[in-house]
């Protein structure tokens, strides 16, 4: 069976691993997943990530906890294959009044909503993190 939405699979694996209090979660790697992991690490939501393997690359994400609780409280897919969500720079959503971040795929790469506003670009809102 082919995977219809690899990014949703990635987010679900992260949520499930955090509920099971795992320290590392692995999944098949892709360019988009690595870009999202890079943004999550830059924002401090994960401890790190690593891509290993040549034939079938695997993405391993090291999860982050604070006082025994996961750092990521909420991880939601916004744009999905059946209903893409494209927003201009003025329409980019603020997550919980600016406390969380939206991850946006722009023509300048995958970045947070704050970085997209600073660059003056809109794009596809991939997911929200709080």
From Swiss-Prot:
What is the superkingdom listed in this entry's lineage? Bacteria
Annotated SUPFAM superfamilies: Ribosomal protein S8
Q: Quote the Gene3D superfamilies the UniProt record gives.
A: 3.30.1370.30, 3.30.1490.10
InterPro entries per UniProt? Ribosomal_uS8 (IPR000630), Ribosomal_uS8_CS (IPR047863), Ribosomal_uS8_sf (IPR035987)
Q: Record's Gene Ontology CC terms? A: ribonucleoprotein complex; ribosome
State the protein's purpose.
Answer: One of the primary rRNA binding proteins, it binds directly to 16S rRNA central domain where it helps coordinate assembly of the platform of the 30S subunit.
Family from the record: Belongs to the universal ribosomal protein uS8 family.
Output this protein's name.
Small ribosomal subunit protein uS8
State the organism of origin. Answer: Stutzerimonas stutzeri (strain A1501) (Pseudomonas stutzeri)
Q: Tell me the gene name.
A: rpsH
């Amino acid at each position: 069976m082919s995977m219809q939405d690899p990014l949703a699979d990635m987010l679900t694996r992260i949520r499930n691993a955090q509920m099971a209090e795992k320290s590392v979660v692995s999944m098949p790697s892709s360019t988009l997943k690595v870009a999202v992991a890079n943004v999550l690490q830059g924002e401090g939501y994960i401890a790190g990530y690593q891509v290993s393997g040549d034939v079938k690359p695997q993405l391993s994400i090291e999860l982050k906890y604070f006082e025994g609780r996961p750092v990521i409280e909420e991880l939601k897919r916004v744009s999905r294959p059946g209903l893409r969500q494209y927003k201009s720079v003025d329409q980019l959503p603020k997550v919980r009044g600016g406390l969380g971040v939206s991850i946006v795929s722009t023509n300048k790469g995958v970045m947070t909503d704050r970085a997209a506003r600073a660059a003056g670009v809109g794009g596809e809102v991939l997911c929200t993190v709080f």
